[in-house]
């Protein structure tokens, strides 16, 4: 591939602690010229010892797809950054000063921001003549109403340490809400929506027009819905209780809540296909995990129906939301009195692209809307660079 077609492309990088995902995107037409993932970064016996090696391998994979970044019309590298704190909430061109400030904010997202910064620093070194832009997961939720963003704790402490509800998966929630409006051929500003991003990480949002009114994740991505490995909402006293009675350290409890809780903590597996197999075999732990997951999901749907007052559309997205018809059914079954009438035939039918799964006479339209965070990030990059 060369730039002779005149297309402008953005290389989108999502750098995690043990994996690096990449996609070369044409932001105008939404076409991905190449996509891939480098895994097992830094693991023992892994051929990818660090993020420098990971990005070089990604470049090799791009070359294998016929992509030469020097001639591919590359105009920007977009980096997904989970947490921007109160400082960064719009797409931001990366320079040394911005990166230094992001390092200072890593305490707010110690599991996510440091590997993202490693990816940024390597990418800037390997592609020094291209603009690098950070797009923040927290950005869309920066302007949550104070009643939703504020925790009822000591105000002085909260202000001093920037403790508030930040929300995450914001790029996905914004993109899906826009795609839902386009699918319905209705103005975005006139719609009230609930978006359910259900993957290994899960989050919900209530959105009025272009403004989010609430979201399930909080100071960190640990709060809210039950997830693959994360607990979601718990009584905060569980932390001190385990420290005092089980002799665990705070870091140990935090690690347990992030990595050994949620569906995997209850059932031993986090893949919903495997969970379904265990349920069908009569595994009680798997059934309990599924019941806890859907119970929490239904609670948030009900809460956000109340927050919005009137709801036009509910959209399911991400890996589970897009592909698991049973989760969608169990999330809204019995809610006919609340205006949600699912069409089970439509729900079971597959298909690509956005599709309606509610009955035609359902007061609230229910959709499946594939997310595309990479495309949204690419478009944000072009926008901030004045393209």
UniProtKB/Swiss-Prot annotation:
Keywords: ATP-binding, Cytoplasm, Kinase, Magnesium, Metal-binding, Nucleotide-binding, Transferase. Pfam families: Acetate_kinase. Its EC number is 2.7.2.1. GO terms for biological process: acetate metabolic process; acetyl-CoA biosynthetic process. It is an enzyme of class 2 (transferase). Mg(2+). Can also accept Mn(2+). Mg(2+) binds at residues 14, 373. The active site is at residue 137. Its cofactor is Mg(2+); Mn(2+). ATP binds at residues 21, 197-201, 271-273, 319-323. Substrate binds at residue 80. PROSITE patterns: ACETATE_KINASE_1. InterPro entries: Ac/propionate_kinase, Aliphatic_acid_kin_short-chain, Aliphatic_acid_kinase_CS, ATPase_NBD. CDD domains: ASKHA_NBD_AcK_PK. It catalyses: acetate + ATP = acetyl phosphate + ADP. It is found in: Cytoplasm. One of its GO terms (molecular function) is ATP binding. Catalyzes the formation of acetyl phosphate from acetate and ATP. Can also catalyze the reverse reaction. Belongs to the acetokinase family. Homodimer. This is Acetate kinase. It comes from Mycolicibacterium paratuberculosis (strain ATCC BAA-968 / K-10) (Mycobacterium paratuberculosis).
